[in-house]
A protein has these predicted regions:
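N-terminal accessory targeting/assembly segments
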Residues: 1-127, 359-362
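Helix-rich effector regions associated with P-loop NTPase G domains
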Residues: 23, 59, 63-70, 74-77, ...
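Phosphate-binding glycine-rich loops and their immediate beta-loop-alpha structural context
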Residues: 108-172
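Catalytic P-loop NTPase motifs of RecA-like helicase/translocase cores
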Residues: 125, 154-155, 184, 258-261
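A conserved segment at the C-terminal end of the G1
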Residues: 209-225
Length: 362
């Protein structure tokens, strides 16, 4: 497998010529095992260790390589072990707040093209949970796709009700459905995956991520387990691992997330709740607290059933949790919203979420 097939495009090649020393080679990190990493270059995987400078110079965990990164390295006497000298710049980064620690950030993966939010439509779905995933993904400048699994366990009417709940919350996202049991939707997913692109699977334990990986690989690479009657999943994936698929795409399987604490997510909040940002632009006063002020568009939209109260409460909760306390100025909101102030409240929820050119500048 050539490096281009692993996702090394012209953007990364420019940084290779700039940052890698003569005699060094390039590889992609496919897994992290405690104090050493597993990297892939060509058809083989081998271990690599970090040079000491990483531990002296890295100010935060973000500076260390993670799954999906491209690195410059040199080999030791054995071709099965190498030392990592440099981490190439990233196109994007997927991260979350470490559960139980207010300021620590956990790095999940880098250089992801599409993040699949995997939810079981039998017992795992909740709009607020979906919004949390979207905030994290949008903050990383990654395209989100919702993947409903276990559709064989619910009726078509129940599935449609879930989709309606998503639309009622003002969420616009590509939705795919499948059943690992019947095979429905698997061909659609396979056709969606593109060669040289990198995808990841995010979701709780027990939603079928490992089973799906085995389906896409055509072999039982990952162990799978059953789910309890309460819907509580069991961890089968214990580490993040980037796997090349037969059709040429790369897929990162993630351990199940029981809790999803978001890190500081300014962009992620703005993009995931842009309907609320658009309504704030319509308030009579720029410093409106959205409580009892006259001319408050937020209060009016809630009273007129144009804004889902749970959607708004989740926005406030995530905003507070992430440490996103700095309010945008009215002028900044104007620039962010652009044409949003011209949107009637009834149309706010139907406005499709897109990444702006500014957001795509990493």
């Amino acid at each position: 497998m050539k490096l281009r097939q692993l996702g090394l495009d012209h953007w990364f090649e420019e940084h290779v010529h700039e940052l890698c020393e003569p005699g060094q080679s390039v590889a992609r990190v496919v897994a992290v095992d405690r104090d050493r990493l597993v990297v892939r270059a060509g058809d083989g995987e081998f271990y690599a260790e970090l040079m000491g400078k990483f531990f002296y110079n890295a100010e935060t965990a973000i500076k260390f390589p993670c799954v999906g990164d491209w690195v410059c390295l040199d080999h030791h006497d054995s071709e099965h072990f190498a030392s990592i000298h440099t981490v190439l710049p990233r196109k994007n980064l997927l991260r979350r707040k470490t559960v139980g620690y207010d300021e620590e950030v956990q790095i999940l993966a880098a250089n992801i093209d599409v993040a699949f939010i995997v939810m079981s439509c039998a017992y795992d779905f909740h709009v607020n949970k979906l919004e949390r995933f979207l905030v994290m993904i949008h903050e990383g400048h990654i395209e989100p796709v919702l993947l409903f699994t276990k559709t064989d366990l619910v009726s078509a009417e129940v599935l449609q009700m879930m989709i309606d709940d998503i639309q009622d919350a003002g969420i616009h996202i590509t939705i795919m459905t499948l059943s690992n049991t019947t095979g429905d939707g698997l061909d659609t997913l396979r056709n969606f995956l593109q060669a040289t692109k990198t995808y990841c699977l995010l979701g709780s334990s027990g939603v079928g991520k490992s089973t799906l990986m085995n389906q896409l690989m055509g072999e039982p690479f990952f162990d799978t387990q059953t789910v309890s009657d309460s819907g509580e999943g069991r961890h089968t994936t214990v580490r993040r691992h980037l796997i090349p698929l037969k059709q040429g795409a790369m897929l990162v399987d993630m351990p199940g997330m029981r809790e999803l604490a978001v890190a500081e997510v300014n962009k992620g909040i703005e993009e995931s709740f842009e309907d609320i940002i658009a309504l704030e632009l319509q308030c009579r006063f720029s410093n409106c607290s959205h409580n009892n002020e006259p001319g408050c568009a937020i209060v009016a939209a809630i009273e007129d059933d144009l804004l889902n109260i749970e959607h708004y409460d989740n926005y406030l909760k995530i905003k507070k949790e992430s440490g996103h306390h700095k309010q945008l100025s009215f002028a900044e909101k104007r620039r962010k919203g652009k044409n949003a102030s011209r949107l009637a409240p009834s149309k706010v929820r139907k406005k499709k979420m897109r990444l702006s050119e500014e957001d795509l500048e990493y």
